[in-house]
């Protein structure tokens, strides 16, 4: 495929499957001499440190499902099956960056509930579930910085597609396609980021035109406090509904 100019986007869960894919990419890179193919592996829930190094060396994009990193019920059976040490490799993110790889986030929709940008940023930065009490992730060293969490949803995606000259960042000459949120993902308190996942984005812009615009949310301090108290219950309803609220 690579010889014909096609990229391979592989879905692999276990460390054996990912090892096989990394070996195939290594062979392809050595045969073609092209270290900028940007083949990608998604899910990658268990990856050995040695293979993470190959992700960096051979330009394999790490499409990580770090939204599943907290110890939620769906992941409760992992550690008893693979052992405590291998469980620490679950849903890696920062370790791929340390190995020189590019990390991209994904939601796995429709297999999993449709997760939005605030949810993805919050779980990437904290490795915890927003708004509800749950055990933290077993591997907090995999937490991303806020900047890297945003790159995983924007500029790194464009890079994976070989489209970094057209999209992914706000620059003159690039496509003006963007979503606007009523939250500062870099500077706002993480509780505010978590709360924003239940609200619509402020606007959607396509080709420089506003195609969706929400009414500004106005409330008193008392109304805001009441909303914050309701958020855990609302979030549990949202998480249980595959289509969201």
PLM ranges: what are they?
Residues 1-90, 98, 104, 182:
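Active-site core of metal-dependent hydrolases
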